[in-house]
Amino acid sequence: MKFQQKPSVCIPIISNPNKHPSDVSIIGMYFLFTDGEEQYINFTHPDEIDSDISLQDIHLHSKTLVFNKKTLVYNNITDGIDVNSYLHYYISDHINPHEFYPKGMEILAKKFYKIEDLGQVIPLSKQFEWARKIAKYVMRVYIENPIDQNCIDYCNDFINVFHEIEKNDILVGDETKKQNYMWYTATGRPSNAWDGFNFSAMNKKDGSRDKIRSRFEDGKIVQFDYDAFHIKLLAKILDYQFEYHPYEQIQNDLHMDIDYDQFKGKVFQNIYGTITPEFMNHTFFRSVQALIDEMYSLYETDGLVKSWFYEKRFSDIQDATPNKVFNYVLQSLETEYNVRKIKSILPHLKNKKSVFMMYLYDAFIFDIHPEEMNLIHILQSAFETDNMSVKIYSGDDFGHIKQI
């Protein structure tokens, strides 16, 4: 049997679907090709004689859609396009694999939940039946939404960037915790949770952050946090020039004699909520309102709007309003800008002991080795492009980082 390298939907059969992608092996693969042909490959499942194709022989077509691509990346196969990223890009959807379980497979998966090699226990025929159901659903979307270069860039950039962060376990107390970034959320803002620990929801006041510390003796947890991030992002896409710090300039222009932190809160409310008459007196916010109106007009006319950098589609927004549509685009703008930024940052860590430890919305957290403290200044320069500036925080643990 020879592997056919042509466009398809690929569903890996893995050793245990309940484990982290870094802890599983690929025991088989199912392919549904665009011409309707199917191919089944068994590597190690006991139900059938192993095929004469090994995992190392698999070289996917560049436009093959791969379900759960993370598992392949951890197994050193980087070809193909992640299915959930693709679905999220075009139809704001993603696949819950449990919803496609055939009846017998669902029963076995629940009964033998704690079995180490669950994938070896469930009959291969049931797993191929499950894979076929997913592939046929994806193929219907695939035929209606041909893959373009923006989609390829989006899917590959997101899977590769978050893999480079996710592969670094985090030291929490005396144990290491795995990360699991999931970016196919409604707004595109990634979550990060695994095995009952939610890094994205860590409270700053309950002490949970105090347990996160450096993996290196005398190492430092260092966070880079953009200053006035959303307002500068909007200024970038609106081609609006501030003469000095945006918050200070807007406050002075509007003659608002209130506490600075209180004013920042008002700015945030006017960006993400309705722009008040007071703020409409400023040319920047009039430009923002014009953009809000333009986005909503496009949504009403075309039934969708597209993200700024990768042109990801947003459609079927529930109870859509001008501000809600704009919020979707704005939050995707934040994430897409940061993914592109991380992509440019990662080469600075090549051959370094220090690691990119975690991404938390518009904050970037690194575990810096004591011999590489000069890396902080290198990273600062890399972050501070596009008129952006960062605040830098450092500490022995994540809960006690202080601005430096």
Please report, for each region that a protein language model flagged, where it lies by residue.
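Conserved RNase H-like, two-metal-ion catalytic cores of nucleic-acid enzymes
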Residues: 1-102
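Mixed-charge, glycine-rich, non-catalytic linkers/tails in nucleic-acid processing enzymes
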Residues: 75-103, 107-112, 116-175, 240-242
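Acidic, glycine-rich two-metal-ion catalytic cores of nucleic acid-processing enzymes
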Residues: 18-35, 43-47, 174-258, 311-349, ...
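Positively charged interface segments
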Residues: 374-391
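Non-catalytic, well-ordered alpha-helical scaffold segments
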Residues: 24, 125-132, 136, 152-159, ...
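Conserved catalytic core of nucleic-acid polymerases
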Residues: 167, 252-359, 368, 386-390, ...
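Short His-Asn-centered micro-motif
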Residues: 66-69, 224-226, 270, 368
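Short secondary-structure junctions
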Residues: 63-65, 115-117, 352-357
